[in-house]
């Protein structure tokens, strides 16, 4: 925003907290923690022998809390919300790293955050950065669904190297809400990964990039068309029209 990054960048699910960004006259941060019951469920998942994504993320979260020496039960019993009024965007970013940064002291215990910024371009808009619909933490997934049902536009990110694979298509088929969303934008991320996979037998980087930029839109058109037809047959005309 205004040429500055606000949210930390990371590819690991443990840092993917749901964040709402909106306009405010002064920089403001609200942190929402897991409830004691939600955290107990995460601890129970971490104790099991399963190697599922949900169990792996739970173990990572519990390990982070132990690493920072935090008494999770005491902290969460003190309330599920903490509010910080800060003097500048830079100060907000420094504070934010403690709660959503990859190595933040309290990152593992945070379910979602709300950020208010004094930026005129945000007036009348809300931006929701979500962990995605396949988030291994169930309570975050439900909150993502709730927000999506109120959004006008959804940006769906998919890695170029696995662009719209079966996992992505299953998510679109099963989780896209039938109300609220008026437009969906596909975003192909991590282009360098696709170039590395595609360029081993091509003469130049330019040729590789051209092929990737041609191949991905073609795949998107074909896969989305098939999904739209399937949703129409299942009696979901609104979803079919959105796609």
Give the ranges of each region predicted by the language model.
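Globular "head" domains of long coiled-coil molecular machines
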Residues: 1-243
